[in-house]
From Swiss-Prot:
Keyword Zinc: yes
Cofactor note: Binds 2 Zn(2+) ions per subunit.
One Pfam family from the record: ADH_zinc_N
Protein name: Mannitol dehydrogenase
Cofactor(s) needed by this chain: Zn(2+)
Gene for this chain: ELI3
Length: 337
């Protein structure tokens, strides 16, 4: 259970950008971390890695941003900036990466996230916010947007006419559908819940809908998809999903179940299929994603909440009772003394 916690941000360094937090998304990983379900949480924890705000101060060496700019910070606030991965704009794969909260920073302090009134980050990890992208419904793109955009691009599922499956229609899944449609893909939503069919097809613009427990539907769709983005963070069978793939098809996991998947090898051997994972993206690609989202009017479907509602929001998140992301209105509801 989250409760008010007082702390101070570091002084604004030469390369730092300080900003007033306006909105912060509530991500499913915040819930996992608050409950220590992944076994890596250090308390006290201040969650939040979908952070949007306005710059209040910049360090002497900051050239990309000025006071008053709208900016975002996603899942990363640090990396070594000198390894092979960082040189390749893949800071999310740096062995010395510093995540936005509950991570040890270079100075030994623990990072605190965006459920807070202000944020300070090195300019390299601050994103320019596109003018026509709403701050509130755009905030979840800093995690959900890049988490789905990056594997679609990397695995070549971003070409018009590509047949893409999206497993799960939650915070990640509904954004994956929008991203894939913007790339021109033919999108099939795969869900355990028939009740989401109308929403998937009519509201989000998916082309087809499969109920994963309906063996006839799954059988009829065998071998039809070039790739699948699996967004489900609860344990679920993956073998039926591999059956939906064409030869050389790719199943990319972006949800993070806490228990291991059951995976026989034969469904991979037959048809040379690939089971892959993907974890956010580098800063350059995240900026590209925000610009792409602004160009195609992609935002998350959000329910904006006051900060004191966050525990209730977490309880509702456990029950998947949100369409599709909570966003905290930090600026108007957090009390600062």
């Amino acid at each position: 259970i989250l409760s008010p916690f007082k702390f101070s941000r570091r002084a604004t360094g030469d390369n730092d950008v300080r900003f007033k937090v306006l909105y912060c998304g509530v991500c499913h990983s915040d819930l996992h971390m608050v409950k220590n379900e992944w076994g890596m949480t250090t308390y006290p924890i201040v969650p939040g890695h979908e952070i949007v705000g306005r710059v209040t101060e910049v360090g002497s060496k900051v050239e990309k941003f000025k006071v008053g700019d709208a900016v975002g910070v996603g899942c990363l606030v640090g990396s070594c900036l000198s390894c092979e991965n960082c040189d390749d704009d893949s800071e999310n794969n740096c062995a010395k990466q510093v995540q936005t909260y509950a991570f040890t920073n270079v100075d030994g302090s623990i990072t605190y996230g965006g459920y807070a009134d202000s944020m300070v980050a090195d300019q390299h990890f601050v994103l320019r916010w596109p003018e026509n992208l709403p701050l509130d419904s755009g905030a979840p793109l800093l995690c959900a947007g890049i988490t789905t955009y990056s594997p679609l691009r990397y695995h070549g599922l971003d070409k018009p006419g590509t047949k893409v499956g999206v497993v799960g229609l939650g915070g990640l899944g509904h954004v994956a559908v929008k991203m894939a449609k913007a790339f021109g893909a033919h999108v099939t939503v795969i869900s355990t819940s028939e009740s989401k069919k109308q929403e998937a097809l009519e509201k989000l613009g998916a082309d087809e809908f499969l109920v994963s427990s309906d063996s006839d539907q799954m059988q009829a769709a065998t071998g039809t998809l070039h790739g699948i983005i699996d967004t489900v963070s609860a344990l679920h069978p993956v073998v039926p999903l591999l059956g939906l793939l064409k030869v050389n098809g790719k199943l990319v996991m972006v949800g993070a179940p806490e228990k291991p998947l059951e995976l026989p090898v034969f469904p991979l051997l037959m048809g040379r299929k690939v089971l892959a994972g993907s974890n956010i993206g580098g800063l350059k690609e995240t900026q590209e994603m925000l610009d792409f989202a602004a160009q195609h009017n992609i935002t998350a479907d959000v329910e904006v909440i006051p900060v004191d509602y966050v525990n209730t929001a977490m309880e509702r998140l456990v029950k998947s009772d949100v369409r599709y992301r909570f966003v905290i209105d930090v600026a108007n509801t957090i009390k600062t003394e």
